[in-house]
């Protein structure tokens, strides 16, 4: 029995398992910034550039708080729309189960939104006034994803943007030292790859909920694909969203080895993610329907976190072994 508005209730409402997906883009940006700092040529006795620690910590905290904020918003508005009824296939939600009252959840949304803004505001010091607009966009994403865009097949684009391009590129930019603040093509490619990998989580979620979403008038990308080309198209999308980022990152690593003479010693680590992703795909294909797909959701979340760790290790070991 979970007491209403208890610490345990808030812990479950925060959905701690989703925090790994929020951390992965920041982790990848840190690895890229570390590599670029270490491989920069210095003039004379100039000190080797180092990534900035304070904005690094702020970016990670901001990502986690905004993820929790998004979870609270999703919990509240799905409950208000009546989406979390007895037909729901996904994990239990706090408002629907009565763990947290509507008033308390609205307060929680306000608190996490303000906390996220407070954490993100100092990043203006390191990234300029543009960081304010980035923060506004992130807050808008938290609300518009659940209330509007997810109903019109835009969820996957938003995931690519706000779990890939925005967090990777912005984190990289603000943690680089003065005089080196720029976003190169490699950072952008890594950001796109990250967004695609994280989108596998949304694909599984929407594949599980496809029938309920269709009845509710929620036209997700998965619903549109299945209605036009059948269920195999959704399964193939899941497979591609895992494999395309591997091709991107392995291509980058090989390019660096040729151009920058970095090590490819850790490159085989990508095979670990490839095997895990394919295994999860087969599991998804076999289960196909119902609440059992929640197991696939858990496996996919694990795969995303493993992907982030592998990318971090391959990038860091690439320049560390070269040095």
Feature annotation, model-predicted:
Residues 160-210, 214-216, 232-235:
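Functional transmembrane core segments of multi-pass inner-membrane proteins
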Residues 92-179:
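Intramembrane alpha-helical segments
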